[in-house]
Regions:
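N-terminal secretory signal peptides and thylakoid transit peptides that target proteins
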Residues: 1-20
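C-terminal segment of N-terminal export signals and the immediately downstream linker at the start
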Residues: 23-69, 73
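A short Gly-Trp-Pro
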Residues: 50, 63-66, 72, 82-106, ...
């Protein structure tokens, strides 16, 4: 074997081994940090809100479950990719990033109330950002691993739609930034 071919072989083998090791570590971390409180099926307790944003009480409802085909027929391709496949829309492309009118943000998949415009702020990230959900019962967080980085995924409690992620760099009073995908939300102005 001549020297350039031998180097290419060694480099290629090392690259494949490193990639395999990285994927193995990610798989181990994913299972080690997986949330055990992931409710596979309902019922779940959520807070309900009137169109004007006032709380109307709590309801215990069955989880919304549909086949992939049913979700695809209900959602746009981008909504399906974001909410059902945990995708992320490109920064500054979502319709709700600069929406600051008074209103409610509901799940695009199941209409669950998620965020109130009073908690929305301009994070400069290109995604709608809130410092807290409208009710802690209406969203849930799940630890995920993405290329070796631990993230707190935010999901709809009622239908398990992927909404975005939460980060500890938000404003007062919570210090949190719920970084959401516009494609996961419907905005309803207060009536």
């Amino acid at each position: 074997m001549n020297e350039p071919t031998r180097r290419a072989f060694i480099f290629g083998t090392a690259t494949v081994a490193a990639a395999g090791l990285l994927l193995g570590v990610q798989r181990i971390l994913s299972s080690a940090f997986a949330d055990s409180d992931d409710p596979a099926s309902g019922p779940v307790k959520i807070a309900q809100f009137a169109p004007a944003g006032t709380p109307t009480g709590f309801a215990t409802l069955p989880k919304v479950r549909k086949t992939p085909a049913a979700w695809k027929s209900q959602l746009t391709p981008v909504e399906y990719e974001v909410t059902r496949q945990a995708g992320t829309e490109r920064a500054f492309t979502g319709a709700l990033d600069k929406q600051y009118a008074p209103g409610l943000y509901r799940c695009v998949d199941c209409d669950n109330a998620l965020f109130d415009s009073q908690t929305k702020f301009d994070s400069g990230t290109g995604w709608p950002s809130f410092y807290q959900p409208i009710a802690p019962e209406n969203v849930r967080e799940k630890t995920t691993v993405y290329f070796g980085t631990l993230l707190r995924e935010v999901k709809c409690t009622l239908c398990d739609a992927h909404l975005g992620h939460v980060f500890p760099d938000g404003p007062k009073p919570t210090g949190l930034r719920y970084c959401m995908n516009s494609a996961a939300l419907h905005f309803f102005p207060h009536s």
